[in-house]
Amino acid sequence: MSSENLSDTQMEYEDEKQDSQEKNANLVKGEEVKLKAKYPGLGQKPGGSDFLMKRLQKGQKYFDSGDYNMAKAKMKNKQLPVAGPDKNLVTGDHIPTPQDLPQRRSSLVTSKLAG
């Protein structure tokens, strides 16, 4: 008897669940109808004007003049030969010490502040 009660409650629960899902679906459809009435062109596929379609098919290369100038600069850089780094130039390998630095030259012009 208890198994029958359990199955009855499960069926009632599933029925209520189905009813609530149907109500939600009806509400959503109602909202969609309201929106379509308010904004009729919203659900259509984007077609646009003939001018827009022509521009899209053409395949615009540059977004603005900055993109054009950057592409132009890249073209110039490819044409120029790139000089390799100087092999005799040492950068960052040697840490100078006070003994390695050349002596400071004294200034010919004397300061007016020094008494």
UniProtKB/Swiss-Prot annotation:
Its main location: cytoplasm. The keyword Cell division applies. The keyword Phosphoprotein applies. Keywords: Cell cycle, Cell division, Cytoplasm, Mitosis, Phosphoprotein, Protein phosphatase inhibitor. Residues 1-10, 104-115 have a biased composition (Polar residues). Residues 1-27, 77-115 are annotated as: Disordered. This is Alpha-endosulfine. It comes from Salmo salar (Atlantic salmon).
